Amino acid sequence: GDALTYWLESYAKENRVDYAALKKRLNNHVIQHIGAMPLDKCELRHWLACFDQVAKRTPVTAGFLLQTCKQALKFCRRRRYAISNVLDDMSVADVGKKPDISERVLSTKELGELLQALDKKIFSPYYIALIRLLIVFGCRTVELRLSEISEWDFTEMLWTVPKEHSKTKVAIFRPIPEAILPFITQLVEQNRHTGLLLGEVKQEASVSQYGRLAHRRLNHPHWSLHDIRRTFTTMLNDLGVDPHVVEQLTGHQMPGMQRVYNHSRYLDAKRNALDMWTERLGILAGTHENVTTLPVARRK
């Protein structure tokens, strides 16, 4: 128990965006069962009893717990805080299973139906906002779940995800497309008193669960909220957006030396890409006027 707590407080708290969920999982499934035992008395069978109990219901979670505990013990060992090698030879397959890697991308028809469903308000207000912004920005769910109103700069038309909310621990800069501005300003006005863009922080598990079932309301084959992000990447690539720009928008760290040349933050290219994307979304949702409109003056 001490070893896991040490890792949680000395490492995970600063370096893992999912710290709160991790702490809860480890407490529920491991620490409360074997936490009172000294680490050197904790044999493989004791650990396995915890993982096996979880695997009966959710084998993927059991595998995740094993990987987390191995990481924690390795951290403690490197720091000479406590030494235990009992989990070294164990793999995910020994206690549970790896998550299925989804390759799901929504079709243009499905994405259009989802956008129309958002307009018809068939989801609750929190999820209408969350899903719409996931579609527009291709961001991670956590970046919106934790988003504070102070991150949104309407003078520069820029959303800055602070490194504390970013999985890669690097700040992410996203231009705010004109087309979504009225929706975001309405959210800000409505939720200003909370300081949070979405008005409250819902737990990751609740949001994931809602997202896993959302497709049913549209009679779609299964998709999850993360599949919206994959759809964003795929469709922007199909629109001919430079892969570097797509990587920047999704907040993936650039490989190797490319990070060094990254200080311009590609803002103009990102703005153009998101303007083109929101125009495409307007067409898919059936809200785009198929008439010649005066171009919106680009904000410098």
Predicted regions and their residues:
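Catalytic-site neighborhood detector that most strongly recognizes the C-terminal catalytic loop/helix
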Residues: 97, 105, 161-169, 181, ...
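Short, polar N-cap/turn motifs at the start of nucleic acid-interacting alpha helices
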Residues: 84, 151-158, 221-222, 241-262, ...
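C-terminal secondary-structure termini that scaffold catalytic or DNA-interacting sites
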Residues: 178-180, 185-192, 200-202, 256, ...
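Basic, Lys/Arg- and aromatic-enriched nucleic-acid-binding interface segment
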Residues: 54-68, 78-141, 145-147, 155, ...
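A Lys/Arg-rich helix-loop hairpin that forms a DNA/phosphate-binding surface
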Residues: 1, 17-20, 31-51, 199-200, ...
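Short, aromatic/basic-rich helix-turn unit that serves as a nucleic-acid recognition element
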Residues: 1-27
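Short, basic (Lys/Arg/His-rich) helix/loop patches that form interaction surfaces
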Residues: 116-127, 137, 174, 188-196, ...
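Active-site/catalytic core of tyrosine-dependent DNA strand-transfer enzymes
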Residues: 105-112, 156, 165, 175-221, ...
